[in-house]
């Protein structure tokens, strides 16, 4: 993230009239432990899984089927916890036009490290599955915060030419799209220098 680092540490942001602060968002660590994706995906896919579950990627199917275990009262508790979490997040974010973070915290893994099981070597298949889920959780970590927030975001390419691509995520809460787009346009102009 050398280019993004220059944006934060260099004078280009100051020259553009921006002030960049490094802040802590403790509420990020307090987000509801059980996500919405599995129960909502299961609600949509459950009949398809019964009819043609073998046509699903086994890893995807396993994640979707976890949604069947959530009880209605747990889902309602989850919705309420999310609303409280959003309020805490917005309280911490309200004085900022937008927030900046890496879109993902790592560069893309080698496909061979996370390729689906091939059934030849059970130990290797298990290791690849474990690595897939570890990497997948990392790749979803930062964007999931914005999703749970019901926020808006975009990712600006900010890598040095010739290096693996990385993105700078510009984000905020719900209905802040215009501001996020305007801030992103200004950042994009700085990054293109």
Where are these regions (language model features)?
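Structural helix-boundary/capping segments
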Residues: 1-2, 6, 76, 87, ...
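Gly/Ser-rich, acidic/histidine-flanked active-site/gating loops
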Residues: 1-35, 57, 69, 74, ...
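Short, surface-exposed loop/helix-turn segments at secondary-structure junctions
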Residues: 33, 77, 108-140
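Short glycine-/small-residue-rich Rossmann-like dinucleotide-binding loops
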Residues: 104
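Short low-complexity, flexible loop/linker segments enriched in glycine and/or proline
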Residues: 30, 34-39, 115-117, 169-171
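Short helix-loop capping/hinge segments that flank enzyme active sites or metal/cofactor-binding pockets
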Residues: 36-90, 155-165
């Amino acid at each position: 993230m050398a280019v993004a680092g220059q944006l934060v540490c260099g004078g280009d942001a100051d020259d553009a009239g921006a002030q960049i602060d490094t802040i802590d968002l403790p509420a990020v660590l307090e987000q509801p432990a059980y996500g919405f994706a599995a129960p909502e995906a299961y609600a949509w896919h459950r009949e398809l899984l019964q009819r043609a579950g073998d046509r699903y990627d086994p890893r995807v199917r396993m994640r979707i089927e976890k949604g069947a275990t959530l009880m209605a009262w747990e889902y309602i508790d989850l919705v309420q916890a999310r609303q409280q979490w959003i309020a805490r997040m917005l309280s911490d974010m309200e004085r900022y036009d937008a927030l900046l973070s890496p879109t993902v915290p790592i560069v893309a893994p080698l496909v061979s490290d996370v390729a689906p099981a091939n059934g030849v070597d059970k130990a290797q298949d298990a290791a690849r599955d474990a690595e897939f889920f570890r990497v997948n959780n990392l790749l979803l970590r930062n964007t999931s915060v914005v999703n749970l927030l019901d926020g808006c975001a975009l990712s600006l390419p900010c890598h040095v030419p010739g290096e693996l691509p990385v993105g700078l995520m510009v984000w905020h809460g719900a209905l802040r799209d215009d501001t996020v787009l305007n801030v992103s346009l200004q950042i994009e102009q700085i990054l293109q220098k």
